[in-house]
A protein has these predicted regions:
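Conserved helix-turn-beta segment of the N-terminal RecA-like "Helicase ATP-binding" lobe
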Residues: 231-257
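Conserved interdomain hinge at the start of the Helicase C-terminal
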Residues: 377-416, 422-423
């Protein structure tokens, strides 16, 4: 009975990290439990209904969940909790949406009292039509997304089996010459295609773009791809031309600068959410063609207005790609209802073990503020506090020491405050990429960095998303936006790309001791711990010692 896990009746799970079975246990509970806190020795997970439903949709059943809890638990698992897990998972799929030859879209139940209960809800009434028989009610087709959101909030997630329109056919094949989809990418495509719609969770660097290409090859239809920014749009285009039968002319870019609508169109979230006089002129892009597949890249960053529109796209196949289902705004349930449940997830560590991602060494370096800085920090206004501790002069010394230590290796210095980055750039004699850097200059510097012409690059937040800097071996983070976990995932993903020479990747986070900087850092580590990375904490003095 000496397992690594303590299961508590409030649905929190405590995992003892140093236990020999901790790693196996983490793999077993990862599909259904969400990590909440991850300090050094004990990690806290929580079991939520949404987590259980996502697991259910990805093909895990209640028996597996119960087995995992019982097998690894140190003490007997509270019986009520096991019953609750089974009942919660059993709620998924008691209501199904499907097509009806006469009535169009219908909601059917296998459990009549559930239908009675939800039909009494004032929120459901306007979304449904006539009662066809005791177990079936008609739903207005335009409310397909809305009713799924509403039912989820009521605790009865509906399984959507209403099928999809095929969209306009367009020939797309994978051009597998000298390469092929990796086993987990194939499984991800199959999981998605079988489920029809939903989210594939894969770490950065594990080739999410190829999963997208695989899905497009299955759909063989016109495709709309939504990405975070223009650079990322160009990367998708480059990758698709290389890996599929598509040509440059078949792929359009719909961004701030270009408005091309082609059989495969890549649009940025930014352009879709641009408002003019309170309306979103570009949202009609969704209706501009009969799309057979819509791909949402980095689905955890999907802006709220796009959700509203996605609710109307329920008849189209939707594939979400992401490294994390955690959203900073807590709208995970909308991803579940509107894009679809999780269809596949591969733990980073397993992919790493297959050699597809270079294993990373994550280190937090704690620096002390000088006496005058501590005084300034103590008397700073609350909103200025983070800036004060994030830009301490000691961080510069540590960064310089680290850059020196890894001289000759491709090193990224990442931060948020422009003046801090400019100063670092000057001291390290390295170019700085920031918000105002033109796209052209940005691409030029990235290329120089890729080819190894420059080995140190200082980047501000702009480099966070979907930009391939394949040969960065070392990342040094000096300041970041207020401890967002998503950001940590993106940043780590930048460096964790597989290295041609099997080099180990290093990720350093430079943090000011005893300040809110340290609290934010703790928040960000959660994500890394969730993925099974060890996070060492070292003192700056040790690093600076000759």
């Amino acid at each position: 009975m000496n397992g690594p896990l303590i299961v508590q009746s409030d649905k929190t799970l405590l995992l003892e990290v140093d236990h020999e079975l901790a790693e196996a246990c983490r793999r077993a509970i990862a599909p259904f439990a969400e990590l909440e806190r991850a300090p050094e020795h004990i990690h806290t997970y929580r079991v939520t209904p949404l987590g259980l439903w996502n697991a259910r949709a990805a093909g895990h059943d209640a028996e597996q969940v119960v087995d995992a809890l019982v097998e690894y638990s140190r003490y007997p698992v509270p019986h009520a909790l096991l019953v609750d897990v089974a009942e919660t998972m059993d709620r998924y799929g008691r209501l199904t949406l499907s097509k009806h030859p006469v009535h169009g879209l219908v909601l059917t139940t296998t459990d009549r009292p559930v239908l009675e209960e939800i039909l009494r809800s004032k929120k459901v009434q306007p979304l449904v039509g006539e009662r066809i028989d005791p177990d079936t009610v008609a739903v207005h087709p335009s409310e397909r997304g809305q009713i799924k959101q509403t039912l989820l909030k009521l605790g009865w997630p509906a399984e959507d089996l209403a099928g999809y329109v095929d969209g306009e056919a367009h020939r797309i094949d994978l051009a597998e010459d000298g390469w092929s989809l990796r086993p987990y990418q194939k499984q991800a495509v199959e999981g998605f295609w079988h489920g029809g719609s939903g989210v594939v969770v894969l770490p950065c660097g594990a080739g999410k773009t190829l999963v997208g290409a695989g899905a497009m090859a299955e759909a063989k239809a016109t495709t709309l791809i939504l990405v975070t920014n223009t650079v990322s749009a160009r990367q998708w285009k480059h990758e698709l031309v290389k890996r599929t039968s598509l040509t440059e002319d078949e792929i359009g870019e719909y961004s701030g600068t270009k408005k091309e609508i082609r059989p495969v169109t890549i649009a940025t979230y930014q352009v879709l959410t641009t408002r003019r006089k309170g309306v979103y002129p570009h949202l009609e892009l969704f209706d501009s063609r009969d799309w057979g597949l819509i791909v949402y890249d980095e689905v955890h960053l999907l802006p709220a207005p796009v959700f509203k529109f996605t609710a109307d796209l329920q008849a189209r196949r939707r594939l979400g790609l992401t490294a994390t289902l955690v959203r900073e705004d807590g709208r995970e349930s909308d991803v579940f209802s509107l894009i679809g449940p999780k269809r596949f997830d591969a733990p980073w560590k397993e992919i790493e073990a297959q050699g597809y991602i270079a294993p990373a060494d994550c280190v937090e370096v704690r620096v002390n503020l000088t006496d005058s800085e501590r005084l300034a920090y103590a008397t700073a206004e609350p909103e200025e506090k983070y800036r004060f501790c994030a830009t301490t002069a000691t961080k510069r010394k540590v960064t310089e020491a680290l850059v020196k230590r890894f001289a000759g290796q491709q090193t990224l210095v990442i931060g948020q405050y422009i003046d801090q980055l400019d100063e670092l750039g000057e001291h390290l004699d390295a170019p700085v990429i920031k918000g105002e850097t033109s796209n052209k200059e940005r691409e030029r510097l990235f290329d120089a960095f890729r080819t190894g012409e420059i080995s140190v690059l200082v980047v501000s937040k702009v480099a966070n998303f979907s930009i391939d800097l394949p040969e960065a071996t070392v990342a040094i983070q000096v300041s970041g936006t207020f401890g967002s976990r998503q950001e940590e995932a993106q940043r780590l993903g930048r460096v964790l790309r597989p290295k041609a020479d099997g080099h180990q990747a290093h990720f350093y986070s430079v943090v000011a001791r005893d300040t809110i900087d340290q609290d934010f850092a703790a928040h960000r580590q959660r994500f890394l711990a969730e993925q099974g990375y060890a996070y060492r904490i070292v003192d700056a003095d040790e690093l600076l010692a000759p």
